[in-house]
Swiss-Prot record:
Native source species: Aspergillus terreus (strain NIH 2624 / FGSC A1156)
Function statement: Alpha-L-arabinofuranosidase involved in the degradation of arabinoxylan, a major component of plant hemicellulose. Acts only on small linear 1,5-alpha-linked L-arabinofuranosyl oligosaccharides.
Domain of life: Eukaryota
Biological pathway: Glycan metabolism; L-arabinan degradation
UniProtKB keywords: Carbohydrate metabolism, Glycoprotein, Glycosidase, Hydrolase, Polysaccharide degradation, Secreted, Signal
Protein family membership: Belongs to the glycosyl hydrolase 51 family.
GO biological process, one term: arabinan catabolic process
Positions bearing carbohydrate: 152, 181, 269, 467
Gene: abfC
E.C. numbers: 3.2.1.55
Name used for this protein in its record: Probable alpha-L-arabinofuranosidase C
Length: 504
């Protein structure tokens, strides 16, 4: 939690950090990933059989090693929009017997050479948990139940035995399951009204929890600010009515929201993720309102927010049907850092956040047949995932604000947009971690910093200007490490992300 006091341009900025004031435990799942059958994310991304850089499973070893640096706790799969016409049964069993299918989300052909077992094996190699999305387009409840049985079944039943026949004796114990993806969108196969979706989601959730009460089910929301979000929460956050249920076990565990931001103007681009903060606040209130109106018992666990698609994405410059391969700038890296600050500040409400996506498609990590490139956006993600864990702690910022146009425009009316964007954590190792983005592209901001009592480790991500990239054969943006004595004022460089660490 960071409180804020708005100053004039003439007043001196200050920042205080209070490690004894713990706000909330940070769920490690806010650093989750996402791999969709889209563009080169799967084929030519995480899976590239025949490439000398791949292992015996066809998994790109360089990609695995890079992703291990991020300590990713969960990876969402297989979509995304792709999911609306995907049938999991096509992607299991002998590969020479798997059918190729037309793919309607991104207008390609799905070979099904990489499916459920391959993905779950990849997760085990990476050391992460899977998060599956169910087909709410052309799929059926029977198909969804069969998939859960295939993954998690322990009894002598058909789909559990099919898994065993395919070479996996022990269950995979897949915990996280989404009830569809963006079913409200006009681009979806089988787009639904909020009324139709809420009815279907509730009925599916009942059946899925009867089959496996340990499942964590995610309701499909919109952007957290829409009537869709309120209606679906109101209809689905109901007291359970089943002889197998208890009041402490909810039917719906998380509510999903999505947001992509982008602007050609740096200042609007870097402050745009503040829209995510307001969306989280509104969604949290809608969850509480639905529970209050429905009379949900206080001892029934409160659902959290699953922000399972977020990133900088301009679909004009990086079209989805052409693989959505963004060339990220320093400005985009600062926007990603602001997103991550938001997630730390709002950790109390968040059960998961998935950057979209993990490889090649609007991704911080790009592959060629010969190697990988870490884009500008990789570096703030790496620093946050490595250090910004443990507890969100109190901080107070006083500085002036950016007063120009925001993207989306409604942010201007609901959020302050300070030149500095801040979050702070206390790690299990006893270190304070302070993340600061200086959005200003013209000047460094000298700030009176209260909190450090000794030497401070400093990690700085910046570049020559806000438009530099790492995709032109040179790493223009990376991490510069230094130290500071922790006394007095610190100058946050123009257009930079800075992480400061000191012993509490």
């Amino acid at each position: 939690m960071t409180t804020f006091t708005k100053l004039s341009e003439q007043e001196a900025p200050s920042l205080s950090v209070h490690p004894t004031r713990r706000i909330s435990k940070i769920n490690p799942n806010i650093y989750a990933g996402f791999t969709e059958h889209m563009g080169r994310c799967i084929y030519g991304g995480i899976y590239d059989p025949g490439n000398p850089l791949s292992d015996e499973n066809g998994f790109r070893k360089d990609v695995l090693e890079a992703l291990k640096e991020l300590n990713i706790p969960v990876v969402r799969y297989p979509g995304g929009n792709f999911m609306a016409t995907y049938h999991w049964i096509d992607g299991v069993g002998p590969k020479d017997q798997r059918p190729a299918r037309p793919e309607l989300a991104w207008l390609g052909t799905e070979t099904n050479q990489f499916g459920t077992d391959e993905f779950l094996k990849w997760c085990e190699v990476l050391g992460t948990e899977p998060y599956f999305c169910l087909n709410f387009g052309t799929g059926t409840l029977d198909e969804a139940l069969a998939w859960v049985e295939y993954c998690n079944g322990t009894r002598d039943t058909y789909y559990a035995n099919l898994r065993r026949k395919n070479g996996r004796e022990e269950p995979y114990n897949v915990k996280y399951w989404a009830l569809g993806n963006e079913t409200w969108g006009p681009w979806q196969v089988e787009q639904m009204t909020k009324e139709a979706y809420a009815h279907k989601a509730y009925q599916w959730a009942k059946a899925l929890k009867l089959l496996d009460p340990s499942l964590v089910l995610v309701l499909c929301g919109q952007d957290g600010t829409a009537s869709w979000d309120y209606y679906t929460l109101k209809q689905c956050l109901l007291p359970l009515n089943s002889p197998l249920s208890t009041s402490a076990v909810p039917l719906i565990d998380m509510h999903s929201i999505h947001l992509y931001t982008a602007s050609s103007d740096h200042r609007a681009n870097a402050t745009a993720p503040l829209a995510a903060e307001r969306a989280i606040e509104i969604t949290s209130s809608l969850i509480d309102l639905a529970r209050i109106e429905n009379g949900v018992p206080a001892d029934q666990l409160r659902p959290t927010i699953c922000f399972d698609e977020w990133n900088v994405w301009d679909p004009i410059r990086a079209e989805g049907s052409k693989g959505a391969e963004e060339c990220y700038t320093l400005s985009d890296a600062l926007a990603v850092a602001v997103y991550l600050n938001v997630f730390v500040r709002k950790s109390k409400d968040l059960g998961m956040c998935c950057i979209a996506q993990s490889v090649n498609v609007i991704s911080p990590l790009m592959t060629t047949k010969d190697g990988i490139t870490k884009q500008t956006t990789w570096w703030p993600l790496y620093l946050f995932s490595r250090y910004m864990r443990g507890w969100t702690i109190s901080a107070h910022l006083s500085c002036s604000t950016y007063e120009g146009e925001t993207s989306p425009k409604w942010v201007r009316g609901v959020k302050d947009t300070p030149w500095l964007d801040v979050s702070a954590t206390l790690g299990e190792d006893g270190y304070v971690n302070l993340a600061v983005v200086n959005v200003h592209d013209d000047k460094g901001i000298e700030t009176q910093l209260e909190g450090p009592s000794g030497e401070v480790s400093v990690f700085t991500v910046t570049g020559d200007n806000v438009n530099v990239t790492n995709m032109k054969g040179k790493q223009e943006v990376g991490i510069v490490e230094s130290t500071w004595d922790g006394k007095g004022k610190y100058v946050f460089p123009k257009h930079s992300f800075t992480l400061l660490r000191w012993k509490a």
